[in-house]
From Swiss-Prot:
Protein name: 3-aminoacrylate deaminase RutC
Lineage start: Bacteria, Pseudomonadati, Pseudomonadota, Gammaproteobacteria, Enterobacterales
Pfam families in alphabetical order: Ribonuc_L-PSP (PF01042)
Any one GO molecular-function label of the UniProt entry: deaminase activity
BP term (GO), one: uracil catabolic process
Function: Involved in pyrimidine catabolism. Catalyzes the deamination of 3-aminoacrylate to malonic semialdehyde, a reaction that can also occur spontaneously. RutC may facilitate the reaction and modulate the metabolic fitness, rather than catalyzing essential functions.
Coiled-coil annotated residue ranges, if any: none
Length: 128
């Protein structure tokens, strides 16, 4: 199955051997996305809402670069560092998925950079 690598202009260069997204058989797989600027610095330190918005905007850019929209998202894997941020993260998350919600899970864990509060990996079916 052929795949296309998705690297939107202006996104950070991954700090490990992966790309922001891949497209195969009409499915976009978005790698775990952290609240990084283009130089891999954590943005909006101690602000779970702003970090979540930044992460979801980055995911949106990857999906749109592949030819899809956020309405095409079918699954999200959410990783958070502290349950106290759960409500704030969900508030912003709901803004990006106002209609039919995708399936998802959410777990608390440590992330690759201590100031990052949220990481999201996404699957979207764009039908191409």
């Amino acid at each position: 199955m052929p795949k296309s690598v998705i690297i939107p202009p202006g996104t950070s260069t991954p700090i490990a051997p992966f790309v922001p997204g891949t497209l195969a058989d009409g499915v976009v797989y978005v790698s775990g996305t952290l609240p990084f600027d283009k130089d891999n610095n954590v943005v909006f330190i101690n602000d779970p809402k702003a970090q979540t918005r930044h992460v979801l905007e980055t995911i949106k850019t990857v999906i749109e670069t592949a030819g899809g929209t956020m309405e095409d998202v079918t699954f999200n894997s959410i990783f958070i560092t502290d349950w106290k941020n759960y409500a704030a993260i969900n508030e912003i998350y709901a803004e990006f998925f106002p209609g039919d919600k995708p399936a998802r899970f959410c777990i608390q864990c440590g992330l690759v950079k201590p100031d990052a509060l949220v990481e999201i990996a996404t699957v979207a079916h764009i039908g191409k």
